[in-house]
Amino acid sequence: MSFITFFVIIAFFFAQINCNSSEAQTNKKEPTPTPTPKIIADSFAYPIGKTEVLTEAKDKKDDWYNAQDFGENNHLGEDWNKNSGGNTDCGEAVFAIANGTIVYAENAGIGWGNVVIIEHNLPDGTKVQSLYGHLQKILKTSGEVKIREQIGEVGNADGRYFCHLHLELREEICPMWNEAGGGYDTIRKGWLDPSKFIDEHR
């Protein structure tokens, strides 16, 4: 066997190995990434107080009451105060009403002060957002939260009002999705009655 013939055979042998290796790599399937599961809001609770359930009335059943209801004076949310009145609720804990993801957490300016918005994925695939306004402090600015996890403290919108929590609940058709909005409007399409929704989804 001549040297040239031997060289050709060796070259052909390595070419076959490389070809088979390339085919194996081409046919090798990439692993399918595991999708990140969405956190589901399968139950709701009130955002203030020592218990998950509150009455809207100023009574002895709990320490809180709904001072301005949804729809009252074109109000787009609810204003929660302590029964003791004034600024006695300043610094009280504010909790997430359900499992969700924070999509907004910053000072929204005059009339709002600090605001947190949480997006909630419902079991049926729809979404709602809860808004917590006039906070004295924001304690969590991003990421997932669990139901009744503290996200802030009751405040007074940088001194503009007596301390209270302004709570809103919105559905996906809301024109103020991911935004603070105005707090009042004659048109309430896209906003939900917070207490009614919470009571229906405990």
Model features per residue range: what roles?
Residues M1-F3:
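N-terminal Sec-pathway targeting helices
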Residues D89-G91, A96-K137, C163-H164, E168:
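Zn2+-dependent peptidoglycan hydrolase active-site motif and core
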Residues N20-S22:
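Bacterial signal peptide processing site
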Residues S84, D124, I138-L139, L169-P175:
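Feature marks short, surface-exposed loop/turn motifs that line or immediately flank catalytic pockets
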Residues A24-N114, K146-I147, L192-R202:
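Surface-exposed, glycine-biased beta-strand/turn segments
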